[in-house]
Curated annotation (Swiss-Prot):
HAMAP family: Succ_CoA_beta. Mg(2+) binds at N199, D213. Pathway: Carbohydrate metabolism; tricarboxylic acid cycle; succinate from succinyl-CoA (ligase route): step 1/1. Residues 9-244 form the ATP-grasp domain. This is Succinate--CoA ligase [ADP-forming] subunit beta. PANTHER family: SUCCINATE--COA LIGASE [GDP-FORMING] SUBUNIT BETA, MITOCHONDRIAL, SUCCINYL-COA SYNTHETASE BETA CHAIN. The gene is sucC. Its EC number is 6.2.1.5. Belongs to the succinate/malate CoA ligase beta subunit family. Succinyl-CoA synthetase functions in the citric acid cycle (TCA), coupling the hydrolysis of succinyl-CoA to the synthesis of either ATP or GTP and thus represents the only step of substrate-level phosphorylation in the TCA. The beta subunit provides nucleotide specificity of the enzyme and binds the substrate succinate, while the binding sites for coenzyme A and phosphate are found in the alpha subunit. Substrate binds at N264, G321, I322, V323. InterPro entries: ATP-grasp, ATP-grasp_succ-CoA_synth-type, ATP_grasp_subdomain_1, Succ-CoA_synthase_bsu_CS, SUCC_ACL_C, Succ_CoA_ligase-like_bsu, Succinyl-CoA_synth-like. Coiled coil: none annotated. Its cofactor is Mg(2+). It comes from Yersinia enterocolitica serotype O:8 / biotype 1B (strain NCTC 13174 / 8081).
Length: 388
């Protein structure tokens, strides 16, 4: 679950990390009043969406008058911002952040993620702030400096100083950076975050460090113990189908193809998408119904898949381990009857009671194609889309 920049900065302030004075506003009048609270300009106004690339898309602007602030708010509030990180429809803008402008001398990067290989929280710092860290990692990886947090001792000030020295910081900047590092690490651990970025972390012309931007991603599996973060969730920034799937504990990710995929197991789901592409098709989604593929969950999965107008056929790929394939077949038949599926449905069942399940599908009289193998299923669903 992602947070907006203004929400990230609110948390930064509570953990002792410096950020520009700013206010999130929902109306042009609020935006003008925010500028008055901040004081003399210039100011920076920013669209609040869960996507990068806002500046290049016109969603971030330096302004010198309250009239310009009002004009920016009127231009964007209630509209959608399209960036290179959004789809063609963009993300809705419901708030803009009005901040005091900062005199920037240099831009740095500071971020943290969970490194699955080392099973540690790893902090990354670089002198190449203000650009995508992925690009830096690809082109000049030697410019990214890392430290890993020991899960027993937690973050240590010496680790912050180590990164500060590698960034070329001196004097008071070392102490300031160490304070930011410790605050960010504590925030990461206490709030069950999955990712945090300050990009850029700037050095002002007065020689001070300021968190100019902030991006936080919370671990969705830990939200049950983070009530404050749950309240910060902005569902308008999420794909409606993905949000609906989450309510049923279905793992759904929308893609750009026209073959809907319903699979039990994340690995099998990825393999299913691969074999669809191998035979010339394009998956419309990733959907993992998990181990408990009940009739109710299968029905909801069909509803979610078919809510995408691009879907011309559905590929159901189920491996019956503990779950019996004949019961899965009953669920598929019931779901197709309830939802009223009007596109071809190709089903491949393998494992526990697979033959009985395939017979039930064949005897149902519905527009369900029972495949004999994974390859056969992929070929049939691609052919079905081509026939349409």
């Amino acid at each position: 679950m992602n947070l907006h920049e203004y929400q990230a900065k609110q948390l930064f302030a509570r953990y002792g990390m410096p950020a520009p004075t700013g206010y999130a506003c929902t109306t042009p009048r609020e935006a003008e009043e925010a500028a008055s609270k901040i004081g003399a300009g210039p100011w920076v106004v920013k669209c609040q969406v869960h996507a990068g690339g806002r500046g290049k898309a016109g969603g971030v602007k330096l302004v010198n008058s309250k009239e310009d602030i009002r004009a920016f708010a009127e231009q964007w509030l209630g509209k959608k911002l399209v960036t290179y990180q959004t789809d063609v429809h963009g993300q809705p803008v419901h708030q803009i952040l009005v901040e005091a402008a900062t005199d920037i001398d240099k831009e740095l990067y500071l971020g943290a993620v969970i490194d699955r290989s080392s099973r540690r929280v790893v902090f990354m710092a670089s002198t190449e702030g203000g650009v995508e860290i992925e690009k830096v990692a690809e082109e000049t990886p030697e410019l990214i400096h890392k430290v890993a947090l020991d899960p027993l001792t937690g973050p240590q000030p010496y680790q912050g100083r180590e990164l500060a020295f590698k960034l070329g910081l001196t004097g008071k900047q070392v102490a300031q950076f160490t304070k930011i590092f410790m605050g960010l690490a504590t925030l990461f651990l206490e709030r069950d975050l999955a990712m945090v970025e300050i990009n850029p972390l700037v050095i002002t012309k007065q020689g001070d460090l300021v968190c100019l931007d902030g991006k936080l991603g919370a671990d969705g599996n830990a939200l049950f113990r983070q009530p404050e973060l749950r309240e910060m969730r902005d569902k308008s920034q999420e794909d409606e189908r993905e949000a609906q799937a989450a309510q049923w504990e279905l793992n759904y990710v929308a893609l750009d193809g026209n073959i809907g995929c319903m699979v039990n197991g994340a690995g099998l789901a990825m393999g299913t998408m691969d074999i669809v592409k191998l035979h010339g098709g394009e998956p419309a989604n990733f959907l993992d119904v998990g181990g408990g593929a009940t009739k109710e969950r299968v029905t909801e999965a069909f509803k979610i898949i078919l809510s995408d107008d691009k879907v011309k056929a559905v590929f159901v790929n189920i491996f019956g381990g503990i779950v019996r394939c004949d019961l899965i077949a009953d669920g598929i038949i019931g779901a197709v009857e309830e939802v009223g599926v009007n596109v071809p449905v190709v089903v491949r069942l393998e494992g526990n009671n697979a033959e009985l399940g395939a017979k039930k599908l064949a005897d149902s009289g519905l527009n369900i194609i029972a495949a004999t193998s994974l390859t056969d299923a992929a070929q049939q669903v691609v052919a079905a889309v081509g026939a349409k």
